[in-house]
From Swiss-Prot:
Keywords: Glycosidase, Hydrolase. GO terms for molecular function: beta-N-acetylhexosaminidase activity. Residues 1-32 form the GH18 domain. It catalyses: Hydrolysis of terminal non-reducing N-acetyl-D-hexosamine residues in N-acetyl-beta-D-hexosaminides. InterPro entries: Glyco_hydro18_cat. It comes from the Eukaryota. Preferentially hydrolyzes pNP-GlcNAc, hydrolyzes pNP-GalNAc to a lesser extent. Activity is decreased by HgCl(2) and maltose. Activity is stimulated by Na(2)SeO(4), BaCl(2), MgCl(2), chondroitin 6-sulfate and phenylmethylsulfonyl fluoride. This is Beta-hexosaminidase. GO terms for biological process: carbohydrate metabolic process. The keyword Coiled coil does not apply. Has maximum activity at 45 to 60 degrees Celsius. Inactive at temperatures of 70 degrees Celsius and above.
Length: 32
Protein backbone atom coordinates (compact mmCIF):
# COMPACT_ATOMS: atom_id res chain seq x y z
CA UNK A 1 0.00 0.00 0.00
CA UNK A 2 0.97 3.64 -0.21
CA UNK A 3 2.48 5.37 2.82
CA UNK A 4 1.46 8.97 3.51
CA UNK A 5 4.58 9.39 5.65
CA UNK A 6 6.85 9.29 2.58
CA UNK A 7 7.10 11.25 -0.67
CA UNK A 8 5.16 9.49 -3.41
CA UNK A 9 8.30 8.38 -5.26
CA UNK A 10 9.91 6.83 -2.18
CA UNK A 11 6.62 5.23 -1.17
CA UNK A 12 6.30 3.64 -4.61
CA UNK A 13 9.85 2.28 -4.51
CA UNK A 14 9.27 1.05 -0.97
CA UNK A 15 6.10 -0.75 -2.04
CA UNK A 16 7.96 -2.46 -4.89
CA UNK A 17 10.77 -3.57 -2.57
CA UNK A 18 8.21 -4.79 -0.04
CA UNK A 19 6.27 -6.73 -2.69
CA UNK A 20 9.49 -8.33 -3.94
CA UNK A 21 10.51 -9.39 -0.43
CA UNK A 22 7.08 -10.84 0.30
CA UNK A 23 7.08 -12.72 -3.02
CA UNK A 24 10.53 -14.17 -2.32
CA UNK A 25 9.42 -15.28 1.15
CA UNK A 26 6.31 -16.85 -0.39
CA UNK A 27 8.30 -18.89 -2.91
CA UNK A 28 10.87 -19.82 -0.25
CA UNK A 29 8.03 -21.25 1.84
CA UNK A 30 6.71 -23.24 -1.13
CA UNK A 31 10.19 -24.60 -1.89
CA UNK A 32 10.46 -26.20 1.55
Amino acid sequence: GKSSSRPLGDATLGDLDFDIEVTQDYWDDLAR
